[in-house]
Amino acid sequence: DASAGNMIWMSLMHAIDAGTLAGDDTSHTGYVILMAVVTICGIFVTSILIGIISSGFEEKLNSLRKGFSRVIENNHTVIIGFNDSIYTIITELIEANSNHRNGRILVIGSEDKEIMDEEIRNHIDDFKTTKVICRSGNQVHSAVLDMSSVETARSIIINEEDDFVVIKTILSVVSYLKSKNAFENKAYITAIIHDSGNLEAARIAGEGKAEIIYFKDMIARVIANTCRQPGMSSVLTEIFGFAGDEFYFEEFPELKGKKFGDILNLFRVSTVVGICRGDDPMLNPPMDTVIEEGDRIIHLAEDDGVSKPSEEQPVIKADGKKAVDKYIEDNEFELLILGHNDSLPLILNELDDFMTKGSKVTVACDSLPENADTACSGYSNLDMSWIEKN
């Protein structure tokens, strides 16, 4: 049968399977030669086709392996920037998500995805209910932000060490959220600034949507308060770490119309410390403050959602110990500070706010700074002096 359809079919079979040639009728020399040529061409075409397909699959797998694929997530936490502090941040977020199923953390860094995955696994043993996803790319590019589903994130943490990069990233994220009409969504941006001169620029870039933390000022306040109170660091770690109890802002509609003093004992497994009205937190407000619609209760609890107010006031026995009403004034305090850096003025300003007048602060350092004379003045409660010693 020498019909066109049959010849096309036979040519296709010879191109796909070289073994078909062995079953051909060898009485027609021209036919055999033609089919042999078709078979040889088919071998080359098939080899090229297999190579193209394999190369395409390999390229796609490499793209997925290197973290260039789109992340389809919702209500996740995005961390922009990969450095040594990433492990502490992820550990705290894992603890925060421990009472939630399917927690997601997305890390965007300039390193390869494989390197970030390996480093995170080496530093963190138990991920509990949280899955950590890494993506590689330049965070100031909208394509990388789009790949990371930033517009559907619950929170965005900018974890960069350079203030200039932080500000650029804030601008990029804000611009991207606006382009997606998601700027007014619940996602909140948090960033750390190391130089006070960049604070205002970072706040302007965030357009009221970013919480800018001045790192040196925060650490200086912690140091100033913990140096006089043994155990204060443990208290701060307990409050601000997600292990144990922490502060939560929750709305309880059933408390509307009640006075703040009346709700203090309604929570059995948490401690009420204040009210948040709009964006203004009020710690320890007057006892006759009335809870309004939309007010959120600030309370110290083990986890969010575990504490609910009871309907009836519990019976309180008044035969226990009472707080001392008399104010006990602190005595003059002497403090030795070893070393000097840019954080010293911040620490001294914080100490000057609450130390008793006449308290003495001595700073010992290898070499006196140029402004040592002026640095000793300007404090209301501190008598400051310098010692130049190793």
Descriptions of predicted regions:
Residues 1-390:
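Cytosolic regulatory regions of ion transport systems
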